[in-house]
Amino acid sequence: MFEVVIGLEVHTQLNTKTKIFCSCATSFGEAPNTNVCPTCLALPGALPVLNEEAVKKAIAFGKAVNAAINKKSVFNRKNYFYPDLPKAYQISQFDIPIVEKGELFINVKGENKRIGITRAHLEEDAGKNIHENNFSKVDLNRAGTPLLEIVSEPELRSSDEAVAYLKKLHSIIRFLDISDANMQEGSFRCDANVSIRPKGDTKLYTRVEIKNLNSFRFIQKAIEYEVKRQSEAWEDGTYEQEVVQETRLFDTTNLVTRSMRGKEEAAEYRYFPDPDLLPVLLKDEFLDIKIPELPDEKKARFIDELGIKESDAEVLISSLEMSRFFESLISQNLNPKLCVNWLNTELMGLLKGELTIENSPVDAQKLGVLIKRIEDGTISAKAAKDVLAFVFENTSVEIDEAIEKLGLKQVSDDSAIEAVIEQILNANANKVAEYKSGKDKLFGFFVGQTMKEGKGAFNPAKVNEILKTKLG
């Protein structure tokens, strides 16, 4: 039997307005080579100037994962040649990163596990190579975008643990609001280092790096395939020939990894301190940066203070947008448990395809009005579902307008309800006698008949209250 050893390197693009060493915009989707200047094009004489906001965001991350923040950190030149790297070196941090020795906790199959974070360092992103119609093009809009590279300890033991770690990391980054962490746009990318060893062995065997995985599903599939490939090679006696230190790409069509190139060692990059950048020396005020409430803290508060079930709280902290939506709801002085039900079950049940909580046709204010109308007895919970579906499709219609249009307003007028109840009791004198002799289940019959006569418009609470008075 084998033990899997996985370490992950995550590159997340920091959401600064400008690049890390120049004033070019970092906006995504611009025309190729428009967000560029002499610095990110590496023209002679152009000098880098460090973006203070990128430093603050790195510190915020360090605090969120209980890491050590180095008061002194150094930028190095990482030398290699590639078309999308104009300088032929990348400015990164090597010996002294800004963040070291952090941790986060994951839960897999009911078990909590601590995963160490070796380091998190600042660096610049490269440009983008585009290969089409027998031509290769280079777009340098992305060159110089600030990255935070987060390196885990090799303490993950399965693809499930790897995905749990990444989801937790992704959530922390989003709640800190230091990156949009959009995997489709490449602002949260993962490289996985995978190796195997016999159970009980502590030696680290040959590791394979799988590059640029940009979805949780593909990360899981890539790791599972690579573990299978290495395990089969070991069992076949071809491990030393088949498993070499290399970089592999994941084929998302066939769900296999393919060799890309040999894996470089650190010495091959010839790191040395960048002579154009002074060491970063942090004042104490930088270390006192306040960070927002993190997912685990928010979850605990929802459970302890609002009495929400753990499973529901998990859904509410599944994204920053989801938790913001919920908190906007409860800020309207509504019953938290009612809010959970209408958000997690009813509204989320309508969101399909490309619709998410971020672009929901029904915002928190509108859903809040609907919940208020349930609480004040204007409509029943059953009718509210029809109202929600209606305003979901007809976004310009307000809740009260929809209630009127659909004719779903409840009747709470005592005299109107009493008149109907009197008719039903007079028409069913025998059943009234049976009820009074001890057949309590007949109460449901009277409620049903009353609601039927009222065509579902009577307030159920009022119906129950009046019936109890009438029947004694």
Curated annotation (Swiss-Prot):
UniProt keyword terms in alphabetical order: ATP-binding, Ligase, Nucleotide-binding, Protein biosynthesis
Keyword Transcription among UniProt keywords: no
Catalytic class of the enzyme: ligase
Gene Ontology BP terms: glutaminyl-tRNAGln biosynthesis via transamidation; translation
EC number(s) recorded for this UniProt protein: 6.3.5.-
Catalytically driven reaction(s): L-glutamyl-tRNA(Gln) + L-glutamine + ATP + H2O = L-glutaminyl-tRNA(Gln) + L-glutamate + ADP + phosphate + H(+); L-aspartyl-tRNA(Asn) + L-glutamine + ATP + H2O = L-asparaginyl-tRNA(Asn) + L-glutamate + ADP + phosphate + 2 H(+)
A GO term for molecular function: glutaminyl-tRNA synthase (glutamine-hydrolyzing) activity
UniProt-listed Pfam families: GatB_N (PF02934), GatB_Yqey (PF02637)
Entries under PROSITE patterns matching the protein: GATB
Keyword Zinc: no
PANTHER family to which the protein is assigned, alphabetical: GLUTAMYL-TRNA GLN AMIDOTRANSFERASE SUBUNIT B MITOCHONDRIAL AND PROKARYOTIC PET112-RELATED, GLUTAMYL-TRNA(GLN) AMIDOTRANSFERASE SUBUNIT B, MITOCHONDRIAL
Family designation: Belongs to the GatB/GatE family. GatB subfamily.
Subunit: Heterotrimer of A, B and C subunits.
Function as written in the Swiss-Prot or TrEMBL entry: Allows the formation of correctly charged Asn-tRNA(Asn) or Gln-tRNA(Gln) through the transamidation of misacylated Asp-tRNA(Asn) or Glu-tRNA(Gln) in organisms which lack either or both of asparaginyl-tRNA or glutaminyl-tRNA synthetases. The reaction takes place in the presence of glutamine and ATP through an activated phospho-Asp-tRNA(Asn) or phospho-Glu-tRNA(Gln).
Protein name as annotated: Aspartyl/glutamyl-tRNA(Asn/Gln) amidotransferase subunit B
Protein source organism: Campylobacter jejuni subsp. jejuni serotype O:23/36 (strain 81-176)
Gene, per the UniProt record: gatB
